[in-house]
Regions:
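Conserved nucleotide- and phosphate/pyrophosphate-binding catalytic cores
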Residues: 21-231
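NTP-dependent nucleotidyl-transfer catalytic core
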Residues: 1-8, 16, 23-28, 41
Length: 231
């Protein structure tokens, strides 16, 4: 018996026919439906959307975010395929997706389950801590060096411009401003935070003692635009 995804049916059929011709034996093939994205695309390296189990290729935080970003239209199928969550709970999560899609309860349940299953509870807690820091619901200064490293690897980043350690040119380097003047204007408008702390001085400098995990600084423009300046 040879098994494979639905797109391998042709190869399986050819193999079965070859064995029949060469040995006279009857063999069998079994295919399963492809697991696809909301756009109907399959997962894979060639499609550019592969998700890795190896933490050196995909950090637990990035792994967690992958599942958290699952589309509403496929979340029920993913829960049934990838988890051992009970039917009743899955149906409840699907109902929640319809009634309160903004809460993303189903996506959170899937992301937690998969991250804990693959990487363990400790890395799940790290992924949750990084998520809270990135989305502004927790103080990033409490992150461990390992958590900071995972966060830095998933954000736009730039090497520290050490010419005076001024914040403004570093905001330009990391893509949060187009020019030093714009960067200083944003700071003056209270639109910039460093490590979760608002900055008011347009000529503020980055202090080495304020680095997160000895790695660098988390900078944010507004609520959703982030970057990481590496020391």
């Amino acid at each position: 018996l040879q098994t494979g995804a639905l797109d391998q049916w042709g190869n399986i059929a050819v193999g079965a026919d070859l064995i029949r011709r060469l040995d006279g034996d009857i063999v069998h093939g079994l295919t399963t439906p492809l697991i696809t994205t909301a756009n109907g695309e399959k997962f894979g390296k060639s499609e550019g959307n592969a998700i890795w189990l190896d933490s050196t290729l995909c950090s637990p935080y990035k792994f967690y975010q992958f599942w958290l970003n699952s589309d509403d239209s496929v979340i029920g199928n993913y829960l049934r395929v990838f988890t051992e969550i009970s039917r009743e709970e899955i149906e409840d999560l699907e109902d929640s997706t319809i009634r309160e899609p903004h809460k993303r309860r189903a996506q959170v349940a899937l992301a937690k389950y998969m991250t804990q299953f693959v990487h363990g509870d400790s890395e799940l807690q790290t992924a949750l801590a990084v998520s809270a820091a990135v989305f502004g619901t927790a103080d990033p200064r409490g992150l461990s060096p390992a958590a900071v490293s995972q966060m830095a690897d998933t954000l736009p980043s730039a090497k520290l411009d050490t010419t005076g350690y001024d914040l403004a040119p570093n905001l330009v380097k990391v893509g949060l401003a187009k020019s030093n003047n714009e960067a200083r204007r944003l700071i003056g408008d209270n639109a910039i935070t460093v490590n979760g702390i608002g900055v008011k001085d347009p000529y503020a400098k980055l202090e080495m003692r304020d680095q997160l995990g000895g790695i660098g600084w988390l900078v944010r423009r507004g609520r959703k635009t982030l970057g990481f300046i590496r020391s």
